[in-house]
Design a protein with these regions (language model features):
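Auxiliary Fe-S-binding modules of radical SAM enzymes
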Residues: 1-20, 196-299
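Canonical Radical SAM [4Fe-4S] cluster-binding loop centered on the CxxxCxxC motif
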Residues: 12-57
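Hydrophobic faces of well-ordered beta-strands that scaffold small-molecule active sites
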Residues: 24-26, 74, 105-109, 135-137, ...
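Conserved, mostly hydrophobic/aromatic
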Residues: 32, 40, 58, 76, ...
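A short acidic, helix-capping loop that chelates divalent metal ions and anchors anionic groups
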Residues: 48, 144-149, 217-218, 262-264
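Conserved SAM/AdoMet-binding glycine-rich loop
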Residues: 65-168, 247
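Conserved strand-turn element in the central/C-terminal portion of the radical SAM core barrel
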Residues: 114, 142-146, 166-190, 209-216, ...
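Catalytic cores of alpha/beta
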Residues: 119-123, 182-200
């Protein structure tokens, strides 16, 4: 190995949440085990075909990182690290503890509820005890009609079950909702039922992202032919409706992903009134709101 090479081999593109900007990205899988969601283009390239990475290769990369890097946080990639058997995940987590003793938090990538539900609460507790502190879950919507239209392969009930399992196991949950996913026709029910799902789950973290199609809408419209995209104002109205419906006790809320026009940050429920006021200003007086321009959205 050339001395200046980074200790980890990546198959591009590699994705991470905004909050993992300073984490070591450690791929334990390549691609997504489902990869059928109509809205998602992240893992559609041929080189991102799903597979579990070789265990020995991953362990060697962890060892090399321990020799060269000081690491505080680790993010397990790619599309859904928790699809791996619990035994394999425990081996990886143990290696992180051994070779990267400064690590304070290990997070798992965009977990599919279907794969979380295959693990028992006891298995998830084992992972938590071994150092897994957070799981990112792309709920996308709490509305069954929207989920079916976009071929998510999940329902309100299946997503709630997965989130409750994680919570019972002591793993923090960071949940993503896709602003605009239901289009104009399903916008209201998308917002209402997403709020209902979050109220039932009470996740530790919640974020909204704007649905977007950098390479075109053909894949998406295969299952949602009458989709009518929300304009910027309608996106804000939908976020406002979502926030109005949320009854959260202690959840960190963020809309700081590159796709968002309006960046929102606060605690729910403490900051609910302030967040709603910021959204209302974006609706009524966009010229006075700190909105991102199209070129700033990085899509």
């Amino acid at each position: 190995m050339i001395a200046h090479e980074f200790p980890i081999h990546y198959i591009e593109p590699v994705f991470r949440p905004p909050s993992e900007a300073h984490s070591l990205i450690l791929p334990v899988t390549n691609g997504c085990s489902w990869n059928r969601c109509g809205f998602c283009e992240m893992y559609t390239q041929p080189q991102k075909k799903f597979r579990a990475r070789d265990e020995a290769e991953v362990l060697e990369e962890i060892r090399r990182c321990g020799e060269r890097l000081i690491v505080k946080r680790v993010f397990l990639a790619d599309g859904d690290a928790l699809v791996l058997p619990t035994r394999r995940l425990l081996v990886v987590l143990e290696a992180i503890r051994r070779h990267l003793p400064e690590v304070e938090r290990v997070s798992s990538s965009y977990c599919l509820p279907r794969n979380l539900r295959r693990k028992s609460v006891d298995e998830l507790r084992e992972l938590a005890d071994a150092g897994l502190r957070m799981a990112y879950v792309g709920a996308e919507s709490g509305d069954d009609e929207v989920l079916a239209r976009v071929n998510k392969g999940e329902t309100y009930a299946s997503t709630l079950d997965a989130l409750e399992k994680l919570g019972e196991a002591g793993i923090s949950r960071s949940v993503m909702i896709l602003n605009g996913l239901g289009g104009m026709t399903l916008s209201a029910q998308h917002a209402d039922n997403s709020a209902r799902l979050m109220n039932a789950a009470q996740p530790e973290y919640l974020s909204t992202l704007v649905v977007s199609f950098p390479t075109g809408e053909q894949r998406f419209r295969a299952g949602f032919a009458d989709f009518e995209a929300l304009d910027r104002r309608a996106l804000f109205v939908e976020v406002e409706r979502l926030l109005q419906g949320l009854e959260l006790e202690d959840t960190v809320f963020r809309s700081d992903h590159a796709s968002n026009y309006l960046v929102l940050k606060g605690e729910l429920g403490a900051d609910k009134a302030r967040l709603l006021a910021e959204v209302r200003q974006a609706i009524e007086q966009p010229q006075h709101a700190a909105l991102r321009q199209e070129w700033q959205r990085g899509l």
